[in-house]
Amino acid sequence: MERLQRIFGAGGGLGHASPDSPTLDTSEQVYISSLALLKMLKHGRAGVPMEVMGLMLGEFVDEYTVRVVDVFAMPQSGTGVSVEAVDHVFQTNMLDMLKQTGRPEMVVGWYHSHPGFGCWLSGVDINTQQSFEALNQRAVAVVVDPIQSVKGKVVIDAFRSINPQTIMLGQEPRQTTSNLGHLNKPSIQALIHGLNRHYYSIAINYRKNELEEKMLLNLHKKKWTDGLTLRRFDTHSKTNEQTVQEMLSLAAKYNKAVQEEDELSPEKLAIVNVGRQDAKKHLEEHVSNLMSSNIVQTLGTMLDTVVF
């Protein structure tokens, strides 16, 4: 009813919205927690090359803020993520179990992956999003690309569908009060698939507290004990044998290079060495790596023998 009032307004259906009706704003942002982002990327990466789907839990803080605190996966995969494919029984049971574990948040939208082909909504995705918006007008659809996402840059975007009646009446789907919603330049692929015609993009932000930052920094933090980790003895033996063979080849090349230095002039020597492998440098590197790996392996074996 609020949507109809906003579309037709108080001006007799002339496209002028009522000043008292709530209007969506371009400065609305979706705040995704670190836990939710990691879960979405892990779920999307596990489903490659198929598409995967899940629901987002959080709350609508105010008219400008949607907070996503957690997500959970749905049993759908592949290209069959449609309105009929959403398992409502699984969704209800999952929400009941999450409430028992201290996660009382409501469903604020859904997410799915586009492995390798960018962030946009297809026709089936738009229908799925409209079914979520029928339950809650501010429901959000998040698309994540686990293939194009790399360390330090996550390819992700949030969308919400545009009512076709709004376009017919010549109205803007959202009012503009700041430049927050215009900071991200849309891709050509998303524009081709109906961005700003059938759906619009919502700005995404990530809010982390001190504990979350500490947790993320400790994910790939190396410890001093990592250097004492023993390798399999058969693997270590094969690596030593391969390294020694490479050292013999490099030693022969270095011996040949030394003999050429005595025979050739400096001008010819500078031309001859262009594009060649520096045998001396690689030989020193192989010797250093071989000695350090054997010292660490021997030291770790001695410590394990004494301790255990």
Curated annotation (Swiss-Prot):
Tell me the gene name. RPN11
What subunit structure does UniProt give? Component of the 19S regulatory particle (RP/PA700) lid subcomplex of the 26S proteasome. The 26S proteasome is composed of a core protease (CP), known as the 20S proteasome, capped at one or both ends by the 19S regulatory particle (RP/PA700). The RP/PA700 complex is composed of at least 17 different subunits in two subcomplexes, the base and the lid, which form the portions proximal and distal to the 20S proteolytic core, respectively.
Please provide, alphabetically and separated by semicolons, the GO molecular function terms listed in this UniProt record: metal ion binding; metallopeptidase activity
In which residues does the motif JAMM motif occur? 112-125
Q: Where is this cross-link: Glycyl lysine isopeptide (Lys-Gly) (interchain with G-Cter in ubiquitin)?
A: 238
Q: Which InterPro entries match?
A: JAMM/MPN+_dom (IPR000555), JAMM_MPN+_peptidase_M67A (IPR050242), MPN (IPR037518), RPN11_C (IPR056263)
Q: Name one GO cellular component term.
A: proteasome complex
Q: What is this protein called?
A: 26S proteasome non-ATPase regulatory subunit 14 homolog
Tissue expr: Ubiquitous with highest expression in flowers.
Q: Which residues form a coiled coil?
A: none
Starting at the broadest rank, the lineage of the source organism is: Eukaryota, Viridiplantae, Streptophyta, Embryophyta, Tracheophyta
